[in-house]
Amino acid sequence: MKNSAAIFLTSSLILLLQTLHGVKAGFICVGSSFPTNSSYQKNRDSLFSTLSDKVTTNGGFYNASLDGVHVVGLCRRDYDRQGCINCVEESIRQIKTSCSNRVQSFHCNSDDRERVSCLVRTTDQSTYRILELGPATNDPSPVAIDTFAKNMTLFRQEWEAMVDRTLEAVTIDNSTTVLKYYGALKSEFSEFPNVYMMMQCTPDINSGACKRCLQASVTYFRDQNWGRQGGGICRPSCVFRWEFYPFYGAFANVTRVPAPPRALIPRTEAISITRLKGGIIAIFVVPIVINLLVFIGLIRAYTRIRKSYNGINEAQYDYGGQSKLRFDFRMILTATDDFSFENKIGQGGFGSVYKGKLPGGEEIAVKRLTRGSGQGEIEFRNEVLLLTRLQHRNLVKLLGFCNEGDEEILVYEFVPNSSLDHFIFDEEKRLLLTWDMRARIIEGVARGLVYLHEDSQLRIIHRDLKASNILLDAYMNPKVADFGMARLFNMDQTRAVTRKVVGTFGYMAPEYVRNRTFSVKTDVYSFGVVLLEMITGRSNKNYFEALGLPAYAWKCWVAGEAASIIDHVLSRSRSNEIMRFIHIGLLCVQENVSKRPTMSLVIQWLGSETIAIPLPTVAGFTNASYQAEHEAGTLSLNELSITELSPR
């Protein structure tokens, strides 16, 4: 009776709080601004004029483009037609009011009273069939769970089980409707109020991407909002929300799902049975596993010996089945005018880079690796095996390769504006980089890293992210390049140890320099250095004799003088936004690896000015040993990957 009364009172309180939490709307404006009455605004408004009608007539989702303007609209499945129209038009009105002249905008409109939810996004880059985790809106309930706080452990277990069931319902949905990735479940918990949970993804992405998007939202809620009475997180690719009351009218015809039954075996008995079974299994399994590991070790040792003795026939090596991307050497000679000096656009640690033109007129960039360079062979193979399997607008595209005789050549898309370092560290060219342009470059690099770490079919650690390895296309969009030092991780692998440190000192994380361990957080550190360079307009090399840029920025932050490091050419009217980016950069370059954020979390922070972010702790290499480590690093520059491009 006491439990029933508590549940009734809690449910009543929740219903009273709906008026506080029922209307949920959030908008985010990012990127550069466009002039009033510009062609961009006219094209955007033209798409807006028909968007609500297009969404409803196309089954609840619509993606449209017009001369560089891209618009996406999504409504909840089983939507009411007029409700969807009203929701989309309200989102458009909010964007025009709050993000009137911003190139990129995102509005998530959720109104319980109108029984509808929708999202609208505008951008200058196509996002069709691309998983987009940011920008994101976060809307937790303002009310904390305290009525049954003593049972929070049990509640969390049942809540997690419900998340798993909803995820499964969403990602294996075989619906023939446009809005195929959708799930709304009601779960009746034995000791708590009913829980209502809804998940939805845009239908243009695949089920794996849908699952990753929703898992990211669940993880964020669990890490940042746990203890709140419900809430929602809205991303361009997915929506997640749960409450103690029905919302959107999404649960009228939903089958109730009972909570999984609790174990009937007493805990002590269950443990003893488990231990007994485990002991029996171990007796038989352990010897088998040991013998298997020994056998695998012998096979691997034999393979290494055989390779070192016989060598590798590069002419017959198909590079992971990518032989179809093989270029004829004579074609490359013609394209580059026999590697003429006039076509040379850069010189790297392992070869030269040339501009070329294919017979069809397509411009290409050709990297000709230095003959006899052992490290160059590793770089060559790495790039072929990795880049041919990666596709993202913020990664440089590998068109093909050539390995005839002693030649090892990589052919890339041509990126006309060279690399970032030729702009940000040049006194004159730096003036061209407005804050909006710098912010867009930073966000683009972050998206490229999220793809490498989380969203591609592989998990890749770049290990050599720096300004000279970020190329800029004709529209100054960034493309991460040079994957010669990259390492492939298993999806469940978190860290690795290398025998030799490779990379560029100043961008390498402390744990990598000191202990030779690396992980996704190693790339996060490098990203933080690049971000701080973008804000200051100065290379980390300029700080070598003193502290290093991360440590210098940290000391200024602690002293309350962080604004002093901002590039003087940037507008002071944007100082609040720039200070937030400095804050994020310092979080990325923290000495403590575990405190550095993931790149997906960085994307969320960059895309929203309302999400609270933690205070940074001490930056890497802040202690007195920095100078000694720098001197040790300069002794091994021959082992580092250093590529410098010069425009012609």
Swiss-Prot record:
| Residues annotated as catalytic | D464
Q: Which residues form the Protein kinase domain?
A: 339-611
Instruction: Give its E.C. classification number.
Output: 2.7.11.-
Q: Which residues are sugar-modified?
A: N37, N63, N151, N174, N253
One GO term in the molecular function aspect is: protein serine kinase activity
Q: Where in the cell is it found?
A: Membrane
Q: Where is the Gnk2-homologous domain?
A: 26-127, 140-247
Phosphothreonine modifications at: T504
Regarding the membrane, this protein is recorded as: Single-pass membrane protein
Q: Specify the protein name.
A: Cysteine-rich receptor-like protein kinase 38
Which residue intervals are topologically Cytoplasmic? Answer: 300-648
Which organism does this sequence originate in? Arabidopsis thaliana
Keyword list (alphabetical) reads:
ATP-binding, Glycoprotein, Kinase, Membrane, Nucleotide-binding, Phosphoprotein, Receptor, Repeat, Serine/threonine-protein kinase, Signal, Transferase, Transmembrane, Transmembrane helix
A single GO cellular-component term on record: membrane
Extract the CDD domains matched here: Gnk2-like, STKc_IRAK
Instruction: Provide the catalytic activity annotation.
Output: L-seryl-[protein] + ATP = O-phospho-L-seryl-[protein] + ADP + H(+); L-threonyl-[protein] + ATP = O-phospho-L-threonyl-[protein] + ADP + H(+)
Q: Spell out which residues are annotated as carrying Phosphoserine.
A: S468
